Amino acid sequence: MDTATHFAMGFGLAGLAYLDPVVASTPSLAVAVMIGTVIGSQAPDLDGLVRLRGTAAYIRNHRGVSHSVPALFLWTGAIFVLIQAIMPQLHWLHLLGWIFLAVCLHVFVDLFNSYGTKGLYPFRDKWVALNAIFIFDPSIFAAHLVGFMLWAAGAHPGHVFLWIYVIIAGYYYWRCQAQRRTTELVRQRIGKAGTFTIIPTLSWTYWTFVAKTDQHWYVGEVISGDVVILDTFSIKPENERIAAAKKSYKVQSFLAFTHHVHVETKERSFGYEVKWIDLRYRSRFQGKSHYMFVAVVYLDFDLTIRDSFVGWIHRGEEQLTKKLDSKRS
């Protein structure tokens, strides 16, 4: 989820904690729990600091081991030690438990969007993305805002957020069911065996999809149950240009993150351009469609890497051209 929703959930858990009689009857503990749940709801995303090492490092590591099973305990322990050092609590087990719940909830809800996490690492070294909830869901955020207003108006925060989280749990179930129904619609439309990835958007009735069969990739959208195929790509075998370009660390980071990839090669005046596109992120800019998340390598005619790029392109091919230098060695 987005940062704002994680913050909202942190405060929401602080309200829910008032169901704990010890928290409710100990003001200093209630404050410590609020600090712990808010920090815990953000902590796994501190891996965003790896962006300072470049986009490739960020892509490879963001929501990776920081969202893994061992990290749940490491984040919890670090936050607990910090709070105990600043404001020691006699009922420290209660504090520890609520911090742990906040960290776990962060990782759990991140599993449901299209970006996904390595939430099952080390038991499974793959990204898990359940594709049921958009990265920012107005309904979930609005539910928390209603809860905060009721809390401010004098309602019991524990009771308020208990009901809110029951409703949100039901909402998650409904969205998962909608995603399954949409998957079946796409499967019927493609009419071939394959893998089908259905991707949520801000709208409840609008989904995008990527489907892979033995010979093709299909990219499209589902609007109120109507399936539309927008792009079709033939799956081609790897050649020596692609193999040479895959030696780039940026490309390796890109391929470690996504498996919804189509690769294209093009001969240029300086040699070759090899471009991978993540088919999940199709967009339009000034009336032209393009894929926003890409990895591109420039090779000379000896298949030596001249330049490379990985990242997001929001304004089309012109923006990409400005980021690469065919003369660099």
Predicted regions and their residues:
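N-terminal membrane-targeting hydrophobic helices
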Residues: 1-189, 194-201, 210-213, 218
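C-terminal regulatory/interaction regions
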Residues: 188-329
